Amino acid sequence: MAAPPARARADYDYLIKLLLIGDSGVGKSCLLLRFSDGSFTTSFITTIGIDFKIRTIELDGKRIKLQIWDTAGQERFRTITTAYYRGAMGILLVYDVTDESSFNNIRNWIRNIEQHASDNVNKILVGNKADMDESKRAVPTAKGQALADEYGIKFFETSAKTNLNVEEVFFSIGRDIKQRLSDTDSRAEPATIKISQTDQAAGAGQATQKSACCGT
């Protein structure tokens, strides 16, 4: 008998794999640390390859285990990260509101998603470092919202430093994915959305990292 969707163990109802992608230095690791560990660091240590954290949350009476992968933003690592797109159920596209180039590159990251990820993967746009002084802001909130509207995805501005909207971002995409999985359960065999143990083992074997940081 096939196992229920992404729920191989009794301590959770769904296992959801998320990816954090975006240019180096936008604060991906800081967002991950803030959400998973409730911590924040000002040190800048570039993530090497891919690392992940796990946090279990409750949504609508269901226990959701979020497996959140922190990808390196540097171009030389992009061949590593493409292998992880296919298993992702949700992708957080992160840019730095004080760095316009990181915002402009979101379109490139979306093209990568369209090329490598599943067609039905959930996406959310995140403008990080919203705590910075307005004089340093390079990307207006309205511009971020307009880009999100163009692609039909949700948009949040966050601050890993002050914890602004960090919980809201992960809970929002988690809830959307849970709903999609629930809808799929009612229509078809769920094997296509289950992350196999083989896939997880392969991913773990490739992941190498240093201390998580504010840099990615």
UniProtKB/Swiss-Prot annotation:
Covalent lipidation (S-geranylgeranyl cysteine), chain numbering: C213, C214
Cell location: Golgi apparatus membrane; Cell membrane
Induction behaviour: By ethylene.
Topology term for the membrane: Lipid-anchor
GO cellular component: cytosol; Golgi membrane; plant-type vacuole; plasma membrane
Keywords tagged on the record: Cell membrane, Golgi apparatus, GTP-binding, Lipoprotein, Membrane, Nucleotide-binding, Prenylation, Protein transport, Transport
Chain residues that bind GTP: 22-29, 70-74, 128-131, 159-160
Family of the protein in this entry: Belongs to the small GTPase superfamily. Rab family.
Record's subunit section: Interacts with PI5K2.
NCBIfam families reported in the protein's UniProt record: small_GTP (TIGR00231)
Protein name: Ras-related protein RABE1c
UniProt source species: Arabidopsis thaliana (Mouse-ear cress)
